[in-house]
């Protein structure tokens, strides 16, 4: 979306004052172009349709590509937004999105995306925390930290993804991820990285697992996550402790 700012420029002549208008156009890449209004013959605004698989999403300074897998549209990269905090500190509901980076190194967020506790991922919707359930319980899409028009996948949506790839975790892993019987083929285009996680003891694990939060809680008080393992092709699900720091992958509304 273009944000258009109008400024008035006064040009002084010897015998008269001429007022001319200059239009300043701020583009999505944060560059600005100035155009004299008297040079414009025609001004047309076009809404470019979103096409999953070819369109990209620019969000919080990052550009994400998209992929169609079966009936679903996914971001191909893990989210990487927010302010990095130390792995020794819990993320908090402070109106600022916070993330962990493996080994507290920003370069690892650039490579793998950020890691988020569950409550941070769902943005504390309906009073959700890492120790209490939302009230009322979630119904419908949970945008959380995803861009507008996207949301945190539910358990059911992850299950649909798994069914689409015939329960083959290697089809979800990026090429070059995994070893032995767990080598990624990325035939789905999901491009999962073994980004690891932030553990409940504040330590980090990387290169062995890919963990993704769902928005779905479990009756035990945890939240369901989908995960892939280094050395096998399984697609796994488990109700994890919400204080763990996992990757977040968004799905289109």
Language-model features, listed with the residues they occupy:
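Sec-dependent N-terminal signal peptides
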Residues: 4-13
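Sec/Tat signal peptide C-region and signal peptidase I cleavage site
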Residues: 15-19
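Structured surface patches comprising rigid loops and adjacent beta-strands/short helices at the edges
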Residues: 36-46
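Short N-terminal segments immediately surrounding and downstream of signal-peptide cleavage
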Residues: 21-35, 55-61
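A periodicity- and composition-biased signal for non-globular, repetitive helical segments
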Residues: 8-9, 26, 179
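Conserved positions within compact, well-structured domain cores
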Residues: 48-253
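Surface-exposed, flexible loop/turn segments at secondary-structure boundaries
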Residues: 12, 31, 82
């Amino acid at each position: 979306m273009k944000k258009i700012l109008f400024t008035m420029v006064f040009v002084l002549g010897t015998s008269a004052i001429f007022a001319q208008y200059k239009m300043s156009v701020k583009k999505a890449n944060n560059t600005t172009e100035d155009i004299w209004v008297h040079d414009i013959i025609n001004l047309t605004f076009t809404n470019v349709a979103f096409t999953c698989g070819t369109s990209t999403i620019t969000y919080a300074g990052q550009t994400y590509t998209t992929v169609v897998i079966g009936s679903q549209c996914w971001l191909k990269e893990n989210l990487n937004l927010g302010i990095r905090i130390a792995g020794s500190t819990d993320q908090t509901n402070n109106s600022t999105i916070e993330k962990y980076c493996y080994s507290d190194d920003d370069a690892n967020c650039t490579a793998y995306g950020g890691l988020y506790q569950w409550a941070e991922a769902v943005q504390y919707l309906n009073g959700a925390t890492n120790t209490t359930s939302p009230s009322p319980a979630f119904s419908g899409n949970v945008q959380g930290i995803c861009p507008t028009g996207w949301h945190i996948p539910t358990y059911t949506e992850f299950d649909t993804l798994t069914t689409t790839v015939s329960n083959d975790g290697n089809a979800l892993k990026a090429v070059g991820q995994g070893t032995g019987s767990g080598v990624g083929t990325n035939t789905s285009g999901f491009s999962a990285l073994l980004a690891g996680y932030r553990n409940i003891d504040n330590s980090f694990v990387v290169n062995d697992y890919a963990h993704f939060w769902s928005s779905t809680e479990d009756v035990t008080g945890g939240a369901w996550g989908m995960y892939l393992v280094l050395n096998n092709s399984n697609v796994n699900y488990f109700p994890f402790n919400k204080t763990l720091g996992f990757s977040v992958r968004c799905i289109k509304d």
